[in-house]
Curated annotation (Swiss-Prot):
It catalyses: enolpyruvoyl-2-diphospho-5'-guanosine + 7,8-didemethyl-8-hydroxy-5-deazariboflavin = dehydro coenzyme F420-0 + GMP + H(+). This is Phosphoenolpyruvate transferase. It comes from Mycobacterium sp. (strain KMS). The keyword Iron-sulfur does not apply. PANTHER family: 2-PHOSPHO-L-LACTATE TRANSFERASE. Pathway: Cofactor biosynthesis; coenzyme F420 biosynthesis.
């Protein structure tokens, strides 16, 4: 079976672990999952968080997925490298290098240095990511949504000048923690971007396409902003099943509620599902999974309530199983 997942953020990476657990891939590899009929997992990963910082290209969501699936993630933070040290950050601070609100760990810095060297040599991000994954063996194909620049920027009211200005998503997220007056999001460069090699084929050839319970605005929304992806979703023969990131009116991780409020969408499973919309209309969903005890009425979308707490890979695998079942696909 071929499974393609649109994903971003820490929660999305943990969702991929559940997919692997169900399919017997990666660190959960089983003998019965090997051979010519082995399952295949492809992740189309958000690049809207990507930025140049300290002279290196940082791709937070790609790295979080790679480290998580490769066993190198910091288990407490859910992002960054396991057993990290911070000597480079301390030295940069001693030199007074800006920005002082963003830090890179020493081990993580090595990843960014390799990536930046390859990008400057002319390799596209998709090939760079493939090369980095050779070290981590993530047990899945990780594809950036695009090789082109497509960055999420945020229009805020500057707390110091009281004037509107646009800042990179990383500054809004890390420096301000989304606690400044926020007016809109813009996916800078997305209109001129193209999908990375393999992305539309992964969607077209899939037996099922899953939307991870990632941030609907700045993770999944950023992916959908790239021309060609929404069209691929609408035309694939695979069923598209989404997972609500909202439980009891709140996201479990991140700031999806703040992002949703900016675009005028309520922090409910039903509102997010309606935001994605039914594929039978102008949207992208065939099915929508909400947390047990929750409900949603979305015309043209089959809704099912199941446990959506990703407490461990085995529990998350049951979430994935429910989505595959809703799609009518047999493992």
């Amino acid at each position: 079976m071929k499974v393609t997942v649109l994903v971003g953020g820490v929660g999305g990476a943990r969702f991929l672990l559940g997919v692997q657990h169900l399919l017997g891939l990666g660190q959960f590899a089983r003998d019965d999952a090997r051979g010519p009929d082995a399952h295949e997992l492809t992740a189309v990963v958000n690049v809207g968080d990507d930025t140049w910082m300290f002279g290196v290209r940082i791709c937070p969501d790609l790295d979080t997925c790679m480290y998580t699936l490769g066993g190198g993630i910091d288990p407490d933070r859910g992002w960054g490298h396991r057993d990290e040290t911070w000597h480079a950050k301390e030295e940069l601070a001693a030199y007074g290098v800006q920005p002082d609100w963003f830090g890179l760990g020493d081990r993580d810095l090595a990843t960014h240095l390799v990536r930046s060297q390859m990008l400057r040599a002319g390799y596209p991000l998709s090939q760079v990511t493939e090369a980095l994954c050779d070290r981590w063996n993530p047990g899945a194909r990780l594809l950036p949504a695009s090789d082109d620049r497509s960055e999420t920027h945020v229009v805020i009211t500057d707390p110091d000048t009281d004037e509107r200005r646009a800042i990179h998503f990383q500054e809004w997220w890390v420096r301000y923690r989304a606690k400044v007056p926020t007016h809109s999001f813009a996916f800078v460069g997305a209109d001129k971007a193209t999908t990375a090699p393999g992305v539309t084929d992964a969607i077209a050839d899939a037996d099922v396409v899953l939307l991870a319970p990632s941030n609907p605005v700045v993770s999944i929304g950023s992916i959908l902003a790239i021309p060609g992806i929404r069209g691929a979703l609408r035309s694939t023969s695979a069923k598209i099943i989404g997972y609500s990131p909202i439980i009891a009116g709140k996201p479990l991780r991140g700031m999806a509620d703040e992002c949703l409020s900016v675009i005028g969408v309520a922090s409910t499973s039903e509102a997010v599902g309606r935001h994605y919309g039914a594929r039978s209309g102008t949207g992208i969903l065939d099915g929508w999974l909400v947390h047990e005890g929750d409900s949603a009425q979305i015309d043209g979308v089959q809704v099912e309530a199941v446990p959506l707490l990703m407490t461990d890979p085995a529990t998350t695998a049951e979430m994935v199983r429910a989505g595959v079942r809703l799609a009518g696909v047999t493992l």
